[in-house]
């Protein structure tokens, strides 16, 4: 049975984005459309949504029918969106990182081991598939990827078992990969399946998720209006670390001219952000109870104090 598509930390996202009538907003990760629809319903504003997954186009078209000129959709990865946005600027930008509930629920996409399906994991349907990767990657590189992107302490044991198995048969399904991972470390009863971290690591690597986040952040100031807000929901410690570092490095800091100066502190003009969330916000216990996918979510927000 498919889980309903529940937007993660929806109320917190709206509170930090603070949509206003007549303003324009960018939803960088359309997915099932939960954020876009909520922003459109909150006030008489405009939303442009992005997604590289062609499977979401029909859902975007339905929202377009309901909101007409207030909604626009572009099929693109957010890291590659700047040219397609044609120098358009926004009063708020939101990113909901990671895999969407819709992608997890469609068995043929190969993101989840809850169904035995083809081992794919590509968000755009293009490039190297998880099956191609898992059957060709060297053992050491595989172990490093599982450790780095999955925080998996048994990464070397898992990589060794995968390489041993593929000498006898090709690994071509999510069920088979999950079985190999479980057998390599033992199936421990608990809330989280032993294969979860390995699947997460392979997905992040296949879709180049961390580098794409860094590429987007490096250029985001060019499309955010003064006083515009940037709200990012992450699900992995490495994602959150990138966002936290970016906010810190680009946030305003009063700088005294000298310790003896009586002048008022000045602001470094290269620091163009003001952090809204002093620390990462987490979902409520009630939300996690209703939507287990929210359990690792963290939200950070900042506001542009200069316009580029």
Curated annotation (Swiss-Prot):
Binding-site positions, S-adenosyl-L-methionine: 33-35, 51, 82, 96, 103
GO cellular component, alphabetical, reads: cytoplasm
Please state where this protein is localized. Cytoplasm
Q: What class of enzyme is it?
A: transferase
Question: A GO molecular function for this record?
Answer: rRNA (cytosine-N4-)-methyltransferase activity
Keyword line: Cytoplasm, Methyltransferase, rRNA processing, S-adenosyl-L-methionine, Transferase
- EC code(s) of this entry: 2.1.1.199
Q: Give any single GO term for biological process.
A: rRNA base methylation
User: What is catalysed by this protein?
Assistant: cytidine(1402) in 16S rRNA + S-adenosyl-L-methionine = N(4)-methylcytidine(1402) in 16S rRNA + S-adenosyl-L-homocysteine + H(+)
InterPro entries per UniProt: RsmH (IPR002903), SAM-dep_MeTrfase_MraW_recog (IPR023397), SAM-dependent_MTases_sf (IPR029063)
Keyword set includes Electron transport: no
Name the job this protein performs: Specifically methylates the N4 position of cytidine in position 1402 (C1402) of 16S rRNA.
UniProt similarity note: Belongs to the methyltransferase superfamily. RsmH family.
User: By what name is this protein known?
Assistant: Ribosomal RNA small subunit methyltransferase H
> What high-level taxonomic lineage is stated for the organism?
Bacteria, Pseudomonadati, Pseudomonadota, Alphaproteobacteria, Rickettsiales
Gene encoding it? rsmH
